[in-house]
Design a protein with these regions (language model features):
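Amphipathic alpha-helical interface surfaces
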Residues: 16, 27-28, 39, 54, ...
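Basic nucleic-acid-binding interfaces
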Residues: 3, 26, 45-46
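C-terminal structural segments of small proteins and small subunits
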Residues: 60-88
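Catalytic DNA-binding helix-loop module of base-excision-repair DNA glycosylases/AP lyases
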Residues: 15-23
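Extended, structured, electrostatic nucleic-acid-contact surfaces
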Residues: 1-11, 18, 49-65
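Phosphate-backbone recognition surface of nucleic-acid-processing proteins
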Residues: 22, 34-48, 52-53
Length: 88
């Protein structure tokens, strides 16, 4: 994946690339290192209104799939994380 650009990943378009760049995630390796939860937390700290679908999209990008195709168990895990972070 090292030759890939962020925009080559599923779920990551021009706007997502710009948003991720603002929080220090400038390439695929940085996204993989951060993971979906950390990347989402960075976006949340910057934007304060980052939604659950963004978290799903980041995880899907890491897995190389459209976020709609994430396993139900993974979606549930991410939703619990999202709810815990939004309450905190």
């Amino acid at each position: 994946m090292s030759d890939m650009k962020l925009s080559d990943l599923p779920n990551i378009g021009k706007t997502a690339v710009e948003r991720l760049s603002k929080v220090g995630i400038n390439n695929v390796e940085a996204l993989l290192q951060a993971g979906s939860k950390e990347a989402w937390l960075r976006l949340l700290a910057e934007e304060h209104d980052t939604c659950l679908n963004t978290l799903y999209a980041l995880e899907g990008a890491i897995q190389g799939i459209r976020w709609h195709d994430l396993a139900d168990e993974k979606k549930q895990e991410l939703k619990q994380f999202f709810n815990a972070m939004k309450k905190g």
